[in-house]
Amino acid sequence: SSTAMSAIAGSSTAMSAIAGSSTAMSAICKSTIACKAIVAKISSYRSELISALADTTRFTKTAGKDVGDGAKTIDDGISTNTIYIPVSCYDDGDTDFNAYSGIDQTTNILSVTRHSGTASVTTGVALRGVRVTGTGSSVGRITFDVYTAK
């Protein structure tokens, strides 16, 4: 229920436990209600989540998925049973990037200011797809590791 999920989202102990559980996260990413309840909190538990996502019995990993095209808005994997973990951002010095969780396309999970080259990313978690927006010019993207629930 959404009430139960809201209670979990309000507890750091509960959030840490579910983020670290491949079984829980597999079920959550298949539920729109559950994702909406935790979308604003899950990025704080990225390290626990990445450990859980390594469970190949529950998730399939696709590494190096590029999303974004300069100053365009690009959606990827919206409404799919996925978790997107941003790992890097490439820019040629003239575009700012934002990524939003696919569950609502409004919860900002990452902001990267314009830079030259590839910058490592160590924050952010998107649930049920991702939206990437660029502000500026024509080149750039965010690279994600995408985990799909089996």
Task: For each feature predicted by the language model, list its residue ranges.
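Beta-rich globular "head" domains
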Residues: 47-50, 54-105, 110, 131-138, ...
